[in-house]
């Protein structure tokens, strides 16, 4: 309705709140909000940048099921390029001692992975037998401007979790931040 982000959060801060939870389409918005107010700021997702609150939930879930993550192998599979969850989780899981592998076609990987504590493969079948967690990401179709895969069917064939791959995972934890694209990253018979 025309009010700037700064005006909104300064008004909320003037009410004496202890904290403000910010989810914004612009990368870095929570950082800016923290400069404007004298309250704790929680980043609930900013643009393509980060999603630390999702990461905290994922760390909690992983530790509840697996205990210590040190030495565990975690694959983050799918649309890494457009996923703020991938960025946050790669760092969080690696910080906890896990080996993190990104699995995606080149067109769905960020162009600059320097500094990411990960290895990269373009073949899910190379790592699926060795995983403790298979973390699937949805295709962020709304954030894509070009055709990044030949088809969703081909993406599913190469990178989707089908019954055969799910069986190969054994007791590994299957995770997804939602919402999922049924039949794209996860086969309907696995979901």
Q: What is each of the regions a protein language model found here?
A:
Residues 1, 64-137:
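Glycine-rich phosphate/diphosphate-binding loop of Rossmann-like nucleotide-binding domains
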Residues 1-63, 181-182:
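Phosphate/diphosphate ligand-binding glycine-rich loop within oxidoreductases
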Residues 13, 33, 126-127, 190:
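Structural alpha-helical scaffold elements that stabilize or flank donor/cofactor-binding regions
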Residues 16, 36-38, 96, 114-116, ...:
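Short, structured coil segments at secondary-structure junctions
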Residues 25-26, 47, 80-82, 138-144, ...:
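Short glycine-rich anion-binding loops that position phosphate/pyrophosphate groups of nucleotides
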Residues 113-188:
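Rossmann-like adenosine-cofactor binding region
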């Amino acid at each position: 309705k025309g009010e700037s982000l700064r005006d909104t959060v300064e008004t909320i801060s003037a009410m004496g709140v202890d904290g403000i939870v910010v989810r914004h389409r612009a990368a870095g918005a929570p950082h800016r909000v923290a400069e404007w107010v004298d309250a704790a700021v929680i980043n609930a997702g900013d643009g393509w940048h980060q999603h630390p609150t999702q990461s905290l939930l994922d760390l909690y879930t992983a530790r509840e099921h697996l205990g210590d993550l040190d030495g565990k192998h975690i694959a983050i599979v799918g649309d890494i390029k457009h996923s703020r969850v991938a960025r946050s989780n790669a760092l969080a899981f690696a910080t906890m001692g896990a080996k993190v592998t990104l699995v995606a076609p080149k067109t769905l990987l960020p162009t600059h992975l320097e500094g990411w504590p990960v290895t990269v493969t373009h073949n899910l079948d190379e790592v699926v037998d060795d995983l403790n967690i298979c973390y699937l990401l949805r295709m962020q179709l709304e954030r894509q401007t070009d055709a990044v895969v030949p088809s969703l069917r081909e993406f599913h064939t190469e990178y989707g979790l089908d019954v055969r791959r799910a069986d190969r995972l054994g007791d590994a934890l299957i995770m997804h931040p939602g919402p999922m694209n049924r039949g794209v990253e996860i086969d309907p018979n696995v979901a």
